[in-house]
């Protein structure tokens, strides 16, 4: 990323909810790790994750919650969905889910829709398709219609697509278009193709 685009991305990350998407090993978590380190020290941050991929070396008020799968020896089972529900009751300024893979999407979406600044990663083939993937996961646990959930996705102000550890696209979400029944997105960055 050039300096201006990097600064724009950091500014948008600090001010509104961000969804980072891409394929396997595309750099989603690497980017999220870097962006969360730019958050101010006086901001309370909750990170919910399945694996220890997101860490901090510097931030004084970043709390990490990890999923705990049930085993044959214990009936205790805290998946990302349960952690996300608990996260909604905590007094935090910023809520992060390392990777959305299931019903926790509904609680991430609810947090963002009520004004909580959130960030997450999700597997999706492009930035403009990422909201559909979050809605697919949210449908696992939701009584909302698909259309209602898509409307709620307008609370994610920034959508980023990663590929080969490069930011390929950044979209700004302009809101829900009731007439077309879709999210209005504006492309604010597209990377130049790499030359070989």
Please name every model-derived segment.
Residues 1-15:
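P-loop NTP-binding catalytic core
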Residues 188-196:
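Conserved small/polar residues in nucleotide/adenosyl-binding loops
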Residues 31:
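Hydrophobic positions on the alpha1 helix immediately C-terminal to the Walker A/P-loop
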Residues 27-28:
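Conserved glycine(s) of the Walker
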């Amino acid at each position: 990323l050039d300096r201006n685009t990097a600064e724009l991305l950091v500014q948008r990350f600090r001010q509104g909810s961000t969804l980072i998407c891409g394929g396997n090993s595309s750099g989603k978590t690497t980017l999220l790790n870097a962006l969360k380190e730019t958050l101010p020290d006086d901001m309370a941050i909750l990170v919910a994750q399945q694996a220890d991929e997101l860490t901090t070396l510097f931030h004084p008020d970043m709390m990490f919650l990890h999923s705990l799968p049930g085993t044959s020896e214990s009936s205790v089972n805290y998946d990302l969905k349960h952690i996300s529900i608990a996260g909604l009751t905590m007094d935090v300024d910023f809520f992060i889910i390392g990777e959305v893979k299931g019903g926790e999407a509904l609680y991430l979406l609810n947090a963002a829709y009520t004004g909580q600044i959130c960030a997450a990663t999700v597997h999706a083939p492009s930035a403009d398709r990422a909201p559909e993937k979050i809605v697919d996961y949210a449908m696992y646990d939701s009584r909302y219609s698909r259309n209602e959930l898509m409307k709620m996705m307008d609370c994610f102000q920034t959508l980023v697509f990663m590929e080969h550890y490069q930011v390929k696209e950044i979209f700004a979400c302009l809101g829900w278009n009731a007439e077309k029944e879709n999210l209005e997105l504006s492309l604010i960055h597209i990377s130049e193709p790499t030359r070989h």
